[in-house]
């Protein structure tokens, strides 16, 4: 039986990835600093470890009897939504850098043959609406919009260096705004889709929700089931170097907010307020991800409807105490 280690197993994408690996017949060990908050883990074994510590990385990767994991999926990071990314720059760079430094080094030294690293399209520069799609090579010369992107770019380069000097196959995906049920929806670390779903679920009919910025920023969003399928296919492919992983459905933040309101069935207004908004526009080439025979299949409206239903249930449960 193939064995996989999922780092960041207590997080949103990590929890869904474990489900995918179990369906594929793996024995899975999950590792995180916390248990999953919204769903029981399906991992065969779950270890509470702090991967900023080198000896915890050794513990995570140790199977005994000279065995190594067939695959390691490194999704552990200190991250959150736009507000968190702009206010916790030091924590993000410090914590995530330590995790990535120690995990890739330990995996390489222990003879792990295949290693997946979760990067982000935050490695790219800001864009103007209407610009041609950015390819993976356009990340250099580098000019990320935030420190989260700089740390991801550094971690990519580090992983590639280890792949050159050890018998380690590295695969890297640049995630494009993953969303869906069973993810953080309150507390400041939530991403835009979950935050909007929460605001709409909490709002009284006839009132309004607040949205940061003027609503014109352009984004694309990728449903979590599509993302984990892309991760799995990329990890088992021959594609070296980073791969943009996301859908082709681009919307403004205003359109996203209106979509959430529409699926809720409520009559609500939108009030735009000052707040961190990130880059103005996004548009990424999908040429390399198409080599995986992969594309995002869940339409945005369907994915938002599923996500809103789940977030609304969480809001109602929290209100009941």
Where are these regions (language model features)?
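Flexible, glycine-rich beta-alpha linker
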Residues: 123-125, 147, 171-192, 218
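Rossmann-fold cofactor-recognition segment
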Residues: 42-54
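Active-site YXXXK catalytic motif of short-chain dehydrogenase/reductase
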Residues: 96, 148, 152
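Conserved Rossmann-fold NAD(P)-dependent oxidoreductase catalytic core, especially the SDR/UDP-sugar
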Residues: 101-146
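Conserved beta-loop-beta element that borders a ligand/cofactor-binding pocket
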Residues: 119-120, 156-184, 205, 210
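N-terminal Rossmann NAD(P)H-binding glycine-rich loop of SDR-like oxidoreductase domains
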Residues: 4-24
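C-terminal substrate-binding subdomain of Rossmann-fold SDR/epimerase-dehydratase oxidoreductases
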Residues: 20, 49, 202-321
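NAD(P)H-binding glycine-rich loop region in Rossmannoid oxidoreductase-like domains
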Residues: 51-96, 106-109, 127
